[in-house]
């Protein structure tokens, strides 16, 4: 009921808290995107070149994006009471899923604009982005496979039991999340299969479906799956 109390995080900073750094990087990224977006759109509106200084903010925002998902991963990995979150690759998983789902959503919006307004982003934009998505999704699935190996090969119940519950339920009783998790697995594997084959990845009819499945899979993994 009093959102102004959020300012207390900055008026009384606590650098030993991960939440303080999370709020800092999120606010910084919001300001960067607001300035970059507003300046670029204003230049587009008046049909002029954007100022040269905006380029340096764009470069800064690229590196800043890494900090957002890294700190978010630290929020989870820093809680020793949750074995499923207590993993060194949690931040890397957040980065990989962000670099595949974020560009995937961007490409889907571009395809929607193309269909509704006739705006064509061109192959010079679509092809590199789809390749980045492919690599990031491959890394994302690989990191989750590392989690599975560590959990089940070690035989530590605290690591394996949460995964068993997510996919199989508990003591023979299905959980509501089981169907969602298997859907995420099917969609993730199917989307990566379509993206790995250049003939499918460069097909503008097939690519959107692969991106939709990828986005749903990563959303389930980073929401219901955590």
Regions found by a protein language model. Give the residues of each.
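Long, contiguous internal "core" modules enriched in hydrophobic/ aromatic residues
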Residues: 11-190, 194-200, 217
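C-terminal nuclease/phosphodiesterase catalytic domains that cleave nucleic-acid phosphodiester bonds
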Residues: 203-206, 224
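Central hydrophobic cores of alpha-helical transmembrane segments
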Residues: 206-216
């Amino acid at each position: 009921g009093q959102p102004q109390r959020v300012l207390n995080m900055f008026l009384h900073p606590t650098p030993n808290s991960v939440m303080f750094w999370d709020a800092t990087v999120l606010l910084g990224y919001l300001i960067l995107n607001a300035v970059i977006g507003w300046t670029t759109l204003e230049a587009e509106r008046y049909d002029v070149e954007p100022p040269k200084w905006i380029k340096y903010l764009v470069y800064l925002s690229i590196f800043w994006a890494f900090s957002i998902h890294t700190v978010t991963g630290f929020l989870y990995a820093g809680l020793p009471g949750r074995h499923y979150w207590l993993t060194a690759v949690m931040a890397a998983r957040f980065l990989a899923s962000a670099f595949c789902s974020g560009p995937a959503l961007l490409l889907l919006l571009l395809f929607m604009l193309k269909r509704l307004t006739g705006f064509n982003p061109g192959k010079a934009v679509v092809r590199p982005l789809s390749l980045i998505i492919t690599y990031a999704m491959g890394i994302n699935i690989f990191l989750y496979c590392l989690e599975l190996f560590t959990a089940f090969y070690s035989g530590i119940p605290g690591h394996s039991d949460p995964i068993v519950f997510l996919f199989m339920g508990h003591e023979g009783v299905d959980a509501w999340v089981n169907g969602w998790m298997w859907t995420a697995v099917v969609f993730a594997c199917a989307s990566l299969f379509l993206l790995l084959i250049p003939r499918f990845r460069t097909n503008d009819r097939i690519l959107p479906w692969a991106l939709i499945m990828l986005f749903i899979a990563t959303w389930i993994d980073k929401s219901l799956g955590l």
